[in-house]
From Swiss-Prot:
TPR repeats lie at residues 81-114, 612-645, 646-679. NCBIfam families: PRK09782.1 (NF007302). Keywords: Cell outer membrane, Membrane, Repeat, Signal, TPR repeat. (Microbial infection) Allows N4 phage attachment by binding to the viral non-contractile sheath protein. The keyword Signal applies. The keyword Signal applies. This is Bacteriophage adsorption protein A. Residues 1-27 form the signal peptide. PANTHER family: TETRATRICOPEPTIDE REPEAT PROTEIN 6, UDP-N-ACETYLGLUCOSAMINE--PEPTIDE N-ACETYLGLUCOSAMINYLTRANSFERASE SPINDLY-RELATED. (Microbial infection) Interacts with N4 phage non-contractile sheath protein; this interaction is essential for viral adsorption to the host. It comes from the Bacteria.
Length: 990
């Protein structure tokens, strides 16, 4: 029995008296048919119209009509109960409860006991006089005594309870008639609960006792009566009633004794326990009594020894309660005698405790075996048995038993004890850790502490797959040793995870060894800041020569020159001047400010022991000093030492690019990209390299990678204007290298008859040096390829059809149609300069003659931010262009030339659309036996539309529609009135 059984709470429930007054109508739901009203058909025929009229008037709150009609009907059939109820309901509906009450009381005289009338009468509220003082209560009682009724007795009693005048309420029950009525019984119940609430325990006891004498006390009330006596601490009354045979059930004895214990009435309780020997009906009741004896008797051991146990199951309790005292006092003989009173197969646990206390190892082992056989799943029994086996020098059997029972599922504390014991036994008997047993022992257990224990077992501690299975969840509860084991296993396969494990171990057990492990691992994963911080935690005394150079190397990688130099000074003091790494680090002190000194140190390092790092560092200086051949040589030497070093391959690829060896550059950059797949600069360079080599599929492949990389960055943070421009440039590159065919249409249509103008300011446009009212040209070009005649050139073939208005001044360019087919060559990679040879043939057979034209054209100042290409950033951009064009007609020996300079502003109006106001000046020349020339200027505006873009291709098509006003400043044979002209311009690039 537990101590908290003394805290039994005794509760009482109070009875709340409420009056439920009906708010429904006085009349039942009677109906209006003859049968429901109890009328003959004739009488119903006569009365129904007036009844219907009355009901409608009542519904419409027409009091006069409703009451008049209902009263008339009642006069006609005064004994009819349903119609009387309708009239009473009407009275109540219009607030005449007194008239309704008189009507119903009169009708009850005619029909005594009618339930319908009584219900309706009872539903009428009765005004209850408010009683708020004792004087008013006594006056009410006096009035009721003069003319007693059940109602007034009940009201006086309830008012007395409310005013806590229990004697007055009790006096009402002296009226036998009232006491026997339902109202009287209610008052008695309320009085009892009120007495309990006010803790007038004697009053409550009297009422319960009266009920017992009247044989009206229920079992629940009897239990409540006992609780009242306990709550009021009416001990003498309880003893008196028990002496009369009341409250003599076993539970009452236990409850009263428990209450005495709770109140601290020790002397009274001891006397009560001695004087009373209840007859219990269950072993649990007897065990509770035994607990009280063992806890509160003057001599608990003697009390229990003298007690005659009624239930056999409680004998062990008696022994269990007395045995610890005997053992504590060292009375082992007495304890054994006490146990001898029980059968040999009982109280094995206690017998085991005695054998352990008396150091009887053989008996303890025998009992441990018996206990284990009874409860083989009980870890405590396994603990006892294996311990006793070890005490009896039977460790092999203990180990076998533990291995059989592994894993130890159950109590965590006992499980940990068994695990520690098994680990100790396996250390002593390693041959027991067979592969099969190790496989079982390495299966992860549910608790982190258990898995940590598993990881240190023989056969597992050095087994990385098993360690990863056990500790791979990285529980924060693992100790430093566990994290170290995990770090060693991840060191080669997952170096970043290994660093995390080393850091966890360092947090739990800071030491020079742990700091060193973190430093080396952090350097391996290129977390130089963490590596440097770890090295700085180690004193110079604890650092080896190798550690000093490694620390200086880490400081160099972390960009901390001061820390590097401090460690280098210590290395110099230790005489490490003949170490190649020392001179490589020493060289870093002079980079980039003193390259000559750095070169000397790097050369010294290479002479001591060639290393890839030294060669790469020296190559970097050579490249900065534009000694590209020396840089290439050193980088090739570095690759011989580290053939698979992706960074060195990339550096050599860049150097070969600088030297102009584009093909060799690609051979280095491609394997470098495999090793550094996420290096964006390397991917960009590969796109440029393959463009130079005219490898369209490869160029587009790397351009797509660049675009995807920029798009991925946009998912994280918004793109900068520079990134946005780069994305567009590579989309343009992707589109440009894939282009083979280009179709273009250019036309200018003069709006004024007789006026001449020119719109020749595009490569391959109208013939240079000539002016027309209108001009039109349609051209198709096919790119043959790059690097055809020179490295970086572009060769194309084209064919065009063009016409003008001739000299007759028609508006549309339909005169002098010619066709031209030629070869166009762009010799320079980075300049817009074309040389073309074209065979021209007339198409109408009348005007013009076939001829061969040699043509050179160029465009300047129209690149980058000043180009007419779409700009992805900003709301608009400034553009300019200087166009030069010259032609030689071989057969006719005619020369023509044009120079045009244009400035314009592109204002974005939508995505892929601009409005472009522009101005330009132009000089034209034409020599055919004589020289002709013209200087003109023009202003205009164009609507440019780019279209056809895809995710990877920038706008491949452009349409321009414009209008231009042009003025000729100087011309030969042109009248002043013809020097001004306006014309429409159309340009399509597809």
């Amino acid at each position: 029995m537990k101590e908290n059984n003394l805290n039994r709470v005794i509760g009482w429930s109070g009875l709340l008296l409420t009056s439920l007054l009906s708010t429904s109508a006085l009349a039942d739901n009677i109906g209006t048919s003859a049968e429901e009203l109890g009328l003959s058909d004739y009488r119903h025929f006569v009365i129904y119209p007036r009844l219907d009229k009355a009901l409608k008037a009542q519904k419409n709150n027409d009091e006069a009509t409703a009451i008049r009609e209902f009263e008339y009907i009642h006069q006609q059939v005064p004994d009819n109960i349903p119609l009387t109820l309708y009239l009473a309901e009407a009275y109540r509906h219009f607030g005449h409860d007194d008239r309704a009450r008189l009507l119903l009381e009169d009708q009850l005289k005619r029909h005594p006991g009618d339930a319908r009338l009584e219900r309706s009468l009872a539903a009428i509220p009765v005004e209850v006089k408010s009683v708020t003082t004792v004087e008013e209560l006594l006056a009410q009682q006096k009035a009721c005594d003069a003319a007693p009724t059940l109602r007034c007795r009940s009201e006086v009693g309830q008012n007395a309870l409310r005013l806590a005048q229990l004697p007055v309420a009790r006096a009402q029950l002296n009226d036998a008639t009232f006491a026997a009525s339902p109202e009287g019984k209610t008052l008695r119940t309320d009085l009892l609960q009120r007495a309990i609430y006010l803790k007038q325990w004697s009053q409550a006891d009297t009422l319960y006792n009266e009920a017992r004498q009247q044989n009206t006390l229920s079992a629940a009330e009897r239990r409540q009566w006992f609780d009242v006596l306990l709550a009021g601490q009416l001990d003498d009354r309880i003893l008196a009633l028990q002496s009369q045979g009341i409250f003599t059930d076993p539970q009452s004895y236990i409850t009263y004794a428990t209450a005495l214990a709770y109140r601290g009435e020790k002397a009274r309780l001891q006397h009560y326990l001695i004087e009373n020997k209840p007859l219990f009906t269950t072993d649990a009741q007897e065990k509770s009594w035994l607990y009280l004896l063992s806890k509160y008797s003057a001599n608990p051991v003697q009390a229990l020894a003298n007690y005659t146990v009624q239930f056999a199951d409680n004998r062990q309790y008696v022994v269990g309660a007395t045995l610890p005292v005997l053992l504590k006092e060292g009375q082992y003989d007495a304890a054994q005698k006490l146990l001898a009173t029980l059968p040999a197969n009982e109280m094995l646990e206690e017998r085991y405790a005695v054998s352990v206390a008396t150091r009887n190892k053989a008996e303890a082992l025998r009992l441990a075996r018996l206990l284990y056989q009874q409860e083989p799943a009980n870890l405590t029994r396994l603990d006892q048995l294996t311990w006793q086996l070890m005490q009896n020098e039977q460790s092999r059997e203990a180990a076998d038993l533990l291995l059989q029972r592994y894993p130890f599922q159950g109590d965590a504390r006992v499980s940990q004890t068994l695990m520690a014991r098994l680990a100790s036994l396996l250390e002593s008997h390693p041959y027991l850790a067979t592969p099969a047993k190790v496989a079982i022992l390495s299966k992860p257990l549910p608790l982190a502490e258990q898995r940590q224990w598993q990881s240190q077992l023989p056969g597992i501690a050095d087994n990385c797959p098993a360690i990863v299975r056990l500790l791979g969840d990285m529980s924060p509860s693992y100790d430093a040793a566990a994290w170290n084991r995990l770090a060693k296993c991840y060191r080669d396969t997952l170096p970043g995870v290994a660093l995390y494990a080393w850091l966890q171990a360092e947090q739990r057990q800071p030491s020079a060894w742990q700091h060193r492990a973190v430093a080396y691992q952090a350097y391996q994963v290129e977390d130089y800041a963490t590596a440097l911080a770890a090295w700085q935690k180690i004193s110079l005394h604890d650092m080896s020569n190798e550690d000093l150079l490694a620390a200086a190397n880490t400081a160099q990688a972390a960009g901390n020159g001061a820390a590097r130099d401090r460690w280098l000074q210590q290395a110099e003091k230790r005489g490490l001047g003949s170490n190649a790494l020392y001179w490589w680090l020493h060289a870093q002190r002079y980079i980039p400010g003193q390259p000559e000194l750095a070169l000397n140190d790097l050369t010294r390092s290479i002479n001591i022991a060639p290393s890839a790092n030294a060669y790469v560092a020296r190559a970097t200086i050579y490249r900065q000093r534009h000694n590209v051949p020396a840089a290439v040589s050193d980088l090739r030497a570095a690759l011989e030492l580290e053939p698979n070093n992706s960074n060195t391959q990339a550096a050599l690829g860049y150097a070969l690019w600088d030297s102009g060896d584009i093909a060799q550059s690609r051979e280095m950059l491609e394997p470098a990209h495999k090793g550094l797949p996420d290096d964006p600069a390397l991917i960009r360079q590969l796109a440029y390299v393959n463009q130079r080599l005219d490898d369209m599929p490869a160029t587009q492949h790397y351009a797509r990678l660049v675009i995807d990389d920029i798009d991925n960055q946009a998912l994280i943070t918004p793109l900068t204007p520079e990134q946005n421009q780069q994305r567009f440039n590579f989309r343009r590159l992707h589109e440009e290298v894939g282009r083979r065919w280009t179709f273009s249409f250019d036309s200018s249509i003069g709006l004024r008859s007789g006026a001449m103008s020119t719109a020749n300011n595009n490569v391959g446009g109208a013939a240079p040096g000539k002016s027309y009212r209108s001009y039109g040209q349609l051209e198709a070009e096919y790119r043959i390829g790059r690097n055809m005649l020179l490295e970086g050139d572009l060769l194309s073939v084209y064919s065009r059809v063009f016409a003008d208005t001739g000299e007759n001044g028609v508006m549309m360019p339909v005169k002098n149609p010619m066709s031209g087919t030629g070869l166009r060559w762009k010799p320079l990679r980075d300049q817009i300069f074309f040389i073309a040879v074209e065979q021209q043939l007339p198409l109408n057979g009348q005007n013009g003659a076939s001829d061969t034209m040699l043509r050179a054209s160029a465009s300047f100042f129209n690149g980058g931010k000043y180009s007419d290409e779409w700009h992805p950033n900003g709301s608009g951009w400034f553009a300019q262009n200087l166009y030069l064009d010259a032609a030689q007609y071989i057969r006719q020996d005619i020369q023509a030339w044009t120079a045009d300079y244009r400035v314009s502003w592109h204002q974005k109006v939508a995505n892929g659309q601009t409005i472009e106001p522009y101005a330009h000046v132009q000089d034209n020349g034409y020599r055919d036996k004589g020289t002709q020339g013209a200087q003109l200027g023009g202003v205009g505006v164009r609507w440019n539309i780019w279209t056809g873009e895809t995710h990877y291709d920038a706008w491949p098509h452009k349409v321009s529609l414009g209008v231009e006003y042009q003025h000729t400043f100087k011309a030969i044979n042109q009248r002043n009135g013809e020097r001004n002209n306006a014309f429409l311009t159309i340009g399509v690039h597809w």
